[in-house]
Amino acid sequence: MRLSPHEQERLLLSYAAELARRRQARGLKLNHPEAVALITDHVLEGARDGRSVAELMASGRTVLTRDDVMTGVPEMIHDVQVEATFPDGTKLVTVHQPIA
């Protein structure tokens, strides 16, 4: 199986998000890379499902709370920007202050 660099990046991100979900299910608090992976995966999958940019910008802020992540992580993540493929093309989705 041959994957383009873009496809490899998406696959790695998807795996990182899955690992974060498993750790979260075990009751562990997520670190910075895990939190970003989970939010990014939420946006990418939402775009794939046909949700709008505005909808994903809003729902991206509900993926994680301060209780879900390690101390200091919310302050480290000001914005998460994701280039997602929608049915009508590729768009940049910015989730501002994603961890409330």
Curated annotation (Swiss-Prot):
It holds the Pfam family Urease_gamma. Keywords: Cytoplasm, Hydrolase. Gene3D superfamilies: Urease, gamma-like subunit. Its main location: cytoplasm. It is found in: Cytoplasm. The keyword Hydrolase applies. It catalyses: urea + 2 H2O + H(+) = hydrogencarbonate + 2 NH4(+). It comes from the Bacteria. Belongs to the urease gamma subunit family. This is Urease subunit gamma.
